Amino acid sequence: MKKALAIGLATVMAVSMSAPVFAEDEGKGIAKEDLKVGVIYIGDENEGYTAAHMKGIDEMEEKLGLDDSQIIEKTLIGEDEGCYDAAADLADQGCQIIFANSFGHETYILEAAGEYPEVQFCHATGTQAASSGLSNMHNYFTNIYEARYVSGVVAGLKLNEMIEDGTVKEDACKMGYVGAFPYAEVISGYTAFYLGAKSVCPSVTMEVKYTNSWASFELEKECADALISDGCVLISQHADTTGAPTACEAAGVPCVGYNIDMTSVAPNTALTSASMDWGVYYTYAVQCMLDGTAIDTDWCKGFAEGADKITALNDKTVAEGTEEKVKEVEDALIDGSLHVFDTSAFTVDGKELDTYKKGDTEYISDGYFHESEYGSAPAFDIAIDGITSITE
């Protein structure tokens, strides 16, 4: 498939001498052969989060029958003014739709969207598209909290096995979580993971430490080591490298990864990973360009649409009966009989929540927190009982 282009290599593809064709021209779609797609990545193929996005772009290209030359990718683009420069360069090269994959890119993508109103800008994990007033600005994410919950069930079953065989005492059943930043995206994810584990292992608690970086192998490894030293008997992560699983493999501690299958670095300890199929969105958005139809301002899909999942269970490490339980939980998520943030499943300072508002939006109704229903980005940022978050 295509090779990712670093920002310094933008000259590889010459700027088109003809005026670009846009999906909004008289409501007509773009002819497939005229389409150009730009992608801005925070990392590269060596970092799991970006690798998952690259896989999604490849999937979109294959499904829609595009050519490698129609996809221009820029890797290692930081959350700074260089992101605007990358977006402007892609627009100047004739890209009619541009994707950016990191939370901190949003300010600069908004700036570019204002400067290039005929180009569609799609930003992953962001929050400002709806309020920006820009019709060409879009946010997208997946219901990754669902996959976090399911991977938590896998972890909880492993903890039960460890309790039963005497490896862990029931009253000392503590998980550790390597978080990137104390943002709602991370809090939502680790809370869902914890609730999944707690649904099958009621005595579990969890400790969270932050690296304050989306992707740092050394910091993630150090953080996992510190959690293990604090008595955590199973580790998960919302951080983008293999640092935490590497630490777990060395220590013989079970782990649940993120973005990609971690068995290549932790064959004896990895259980599964929470993962997203970004190809579902990329295919949808680019198909909209071809059809001349509007792209959703906020897009978020989950298990039912195949947008998030857990990676293959590691038969070498998971507890007996895990596959059957996972199927049961996934089916319940898909048919709507299970809600990850069911308020009867957690307390805050010993009390069950019946209301939680952000601005004028009430997130709790019908007995659960309605995650990602009022915007694509996660909103759950509540500190619940059973989880200790260390932000130092």
Please place each PLM-identified region on the residue numbering:
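Gram-positive cell-envelope targeting signals
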Residues: 1-29, 97
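A residue-level marker of the well-folded mature domains of exported/periplasmic proteins
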Residues: 23-392
